[in-house]
């Protein structure tokens, strides 16, 4: 049984009629680790941006004009190429002229992206926390516990405590109770850390949540939080 048919079997179990697969992972960075390149796994396409829409009887790959020729050479025969903006996902969904349930991994999409995809269609969206591509991808390589390091002051120029203090003042000024930061480049800058999660950029993946007093109440950097950084943050 090929990958698409396996995915459709999982869709049936979830009572879904379709499924979305983006290029990005949950950190929305420019570079996607090989073991999170779900679009390549399901379609064969290796370009830097794209979106797959899997229906019960058809499969679509949406790419912009830069990638149409590349996609023709790479994609599996199950897929039809749709060049954006000539054909957008909501065109396909709208022209189905029927109600369908569209499954997606909520970690991989913003609300605005979803609104654009389902606009003017009869689509009901259904978040599925366990990614269905991962369920099909049995031989996926394990996520590496990539190391990261703290920059010396001569390189970053400003202590992370000073930066957090500025955030604290801003939150109080605007009467904001919490600030969630998920952009990996912002976190790397804020905490003066660098890493190797991206193949072509010294970034470390993570998410950070501040309260209105500027205190870090949640820090997620995979499972890599080493003792030195942990001690520094706990002093705050």
Regions found by a protein language model. Give the residues of each.
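N-terminal accessory/capping or targeting/presequence segment of soluble
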Residues: 1-95, 109, 113-116, 120-236
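Ligand-binding face of N-terminal immunoglobulin V-set domains in extracellular IgSF glycoproteins
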Residues: 102
